[in-house]
Each structure stands twice: as C-alpha cells, then as structure tokens.
A protein has these predicted regions:
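Short, acidic/turn-prone active-site loops that include or flank metal/cofactor-
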Residues: 1, 65-67, 92, 130-132, ...
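Short, charged, surface-exposed secondary-structure boundary motifs
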Residues: 4, 95-96, 155-160
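Conserved beta-strand segments that form the floor/walls of ligand-binding pockets within enzyme
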Residues: 14-16, 34-35, 61, 105, ...
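Active-site/ligand-binding-proximal alpha/beta "capping" segment
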Residues: 106-154
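Arg/Lys-rich RNA-binding interfaces used to dock onto structured RNA substrates
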Residues: 1-41
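RNA substrate-binding interface of SAM-dependent RNA methyltransferases
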Residues: 25-111
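Short, hinge-like loop/turn segments at secondary-structure boundaries
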Residues: 11-13, 77-81, 122-125
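Structured adenosyl-cofactor binding patch, chiefly the S-adenosyl-L-methionine
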Residues: 51-55, 69-83, 136-161
Length: 161
C-alpha cells in the first residue's frame, strides 16, 4: 500500500473504477450539471464532486485546464463519490455554446442572490477558477449570474461552496 499511496499514512483501502461516460453520452435535460472553468485546487475539486454526489448531480463537465480528476488529493477528498459522478473534460466554451435549451447559471461574486431566483428543476452551474473566476467568454454564455448572499466580512467564498 505504501508504494501506491502519496500520503505519509496510507489508507488501507484500494478501489478500482471503470472510466466514466464520454461527453456524447451525458444527458443534461431535466437535471443539474456542474461546469468547472479551470479549477486548480485538488481539494476544491474533490469537495465539489462529493457535494454533487450528495445533491444527486450526475455530471461535471470540466475545462481542459481543470485539475486532473485522478490527482490523489482529488480522489481522496471525494470519499468514493468519484465512482458515482460522471466527470468529463472538454472545451467548455464550445460545449456550453451548444446547450440552447438549458439555463446556464454563472457563480459570481456579484449576481442575483440565489434565494431570489425561481427554483429551477434543471440547469448548468458554471464555477470558475479560484483566483480568476469565470472567463469572460464563458460568462457571456450564462443567462444569469448568481451569488450566495454575504453576511460577514470575508472577501470571497471558496470555489467548492
């Protein structure tokens, strides 16, 4: 186990997963999908995968520059959710441009408060890079910019939130 692990204290569990669906097999109608625009932190990515699994989000579409889903920190922080959520890498600008019948929401610092929008039953949520946010070209494809209302004094939220 020590040879397989990248941490000083290796877990005593090994898992084998079949690689997930290709992009053309992913169904987005009547469900929520997460799109990641150049997310870099493995811990954030793992947390997003785990949270997606908790809420029943089946698909995460990643830009080609998003951290590798098989990074050891990503895998560990998913707590096995990686085996239940489809993660696919593609050119997200082109992919989003093709999604004409599904609402695209961009998670931004300055947008409509999430508690002020009608509760959608489907849609695509775009989450940006931890330091740069969502690229302007991707933002232009979003029908609505949304944010979580701020109560305290923190400058921003972690991308995984």
């Amino acid at each position: 186990m020590g040879k397989l692990a990248t941490y000083a204290t290796a877990n005593k569990v090994v898992a084998v997963f079949q690689k997930r669906e290709s992009l053309n097999k992913i169904e987005i109608k009547n469900r929520f999908t997460i799109v990641l625009d150049d997310l870099q932190d493995p811990g954030n990515f793992g947390t997003i995968i785990r949270t997606a699994d908790w809420f029943g989000v089946e698909n995460i579409i990643c830009s080609e520059n998003t951290v590798d889903m098989y990074n050891s920190k990503v895998v560990q922080s998913t707590m096995a959710s990686l085996g239940r959520v489809n993660v696919v890498y593609t050119d997200i600008f082109n992919w989003l441009s093709e999604q004409e019948k599904v609402n695209i929401y961009a998670a931004t610092l300055h947008g409509k408060f999430i508690n002020e929008i009608n509760k959608p039953t489907e849609g695509i949520l775009v989450i940006g890079n931890e330091s740069k946010g969502i690229k302007d070209s991707i933002l232009q494809l979003a029908g609505e910019k949304i944010t979580i209302p701020k109560k305290g004094h923190a400058e921003s939220l972690n991308a995984a939130v």
